[in-house]
Structure formats: C-alpha cells, structure tokens
C-alpha cells in the first residue's frame, strides 16, 4: 500500500480520485517516479499503462535523469493534455537525432534545448473506449531535453509548487482550480494565481512562492454567486512558459499530508 500520496477530488464518472506524491519534512515530491499513477484516476492509470509499457524505459537508457511534469501528475490535466517529460542529456542534439529516426518530431528551441513530440494511442481499453474524441484515445508526449539538472527547471519547480498548494488548501481548492482549467481554459499556474490573487506573469509569480512559507498563504472558497459573477479582472495575463528555463531554486516549504489513500485495484 502506498501511504505517501495526497489524494484529491474525483472525476466526472465518480471514479477514484487523483493522487500525487506528498511532500515530506525533508523533501519535495519526487516527479521521477511513476508508481503513484497506477493508484489514481482513470487518466492517470491510462498514462501509467502507456509509460510503463516501454516508453519510459527506452528513454531511461538514454537519459541521465528524467521526470514527468505534466499537469496529469497532480490530476489537473484536460482531454488532449500533453505528457511533459524532462530529460537530462549531455548532448540534446544527438538525442534528438536518435529519436527523430524513431518517429519523434524534433525541434531546436535554442539554448541547447530540444523539444521532441510524438502521439501514442492509449493502451488501456477503458481509455480507448472513452469516446469518439481522438484526444481522449491518445496521449501526446513532449520531451524537453537539456543538459541542465531537472530539479532546476521550471517544469519541476512549477509542479512542485502547485502540488504543495493543492496539499495546503485541499479538495475544495483543487476543484476550483480544475473548474478554471476546464471552463475557462486557464493553465494550472494561471488558475492558481487567480485564486490566490497573485498578479503579473503567473509563471514568475508562482516561482516567487519558493521564498515564502506556504502555510502563511490564505484562500477562501468563493460563494456560488462569486463564481457566476466573477469578471476575471484579477486574472493574470496569459504568458508562455518553457518547462526548461533554469534559475536558482530554493526548496519550497510544503506541509506534510495526513492522508493515507488506499490504492485502487
């Protein structure tokens, strides 16, 4: 039984909740692991089935370090969301050339960073039968390849902070962030910044929380009237964020989960 997971929300079919690695007093969540996905909601289990069928192991033979930093890792993905994987490799161009020969689409993003993209069909039957929408029957994968240590990259740092905020504020906050994701199309970072009243570029605003004690932050569940009358005036502007821009990182202060979710079968 995995007892180091935070468990939040349920999906539209009342299936098991989303899960993610909980923070500990001495360490932030470990996004290198995949095991927790097997105990999550249907989309998390679908991604686990695909990645553990050979994709992850194949990448691991080439990479010095890897991490899954998709919003799926914290249950905030939408149909069509990518599986974003950070890959540390000493020669990203060489890595890109090798995988381009295997059907991956490679593009040079500059700064010794390469992006590789490929779409895989779902392997689990429940995903394949989920509907006629192609986005729900396949997984787009994006590999961000760089020689930089993955824990210094924005993708790792953003996901760590978002997980800590979900753990800090719980299920109601999770549902409100997911509502903004699904109904208004906001990125996870932008949705959280709106709810917390953080102005400016949401990606930069979120990283500023690395220097703060998250226990000092406050958030109040909006009333139903607030949800329907909100004009979005406090919403941060839309910005593009690369998961691999590296800057000096401090360890976020994350509360420890008191939950011990029972894994699904």
Region roles according to the model:
Residues 104-127, 131-151:
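Conserved catalytic core of two-metal-ion nucleotidyltransferases
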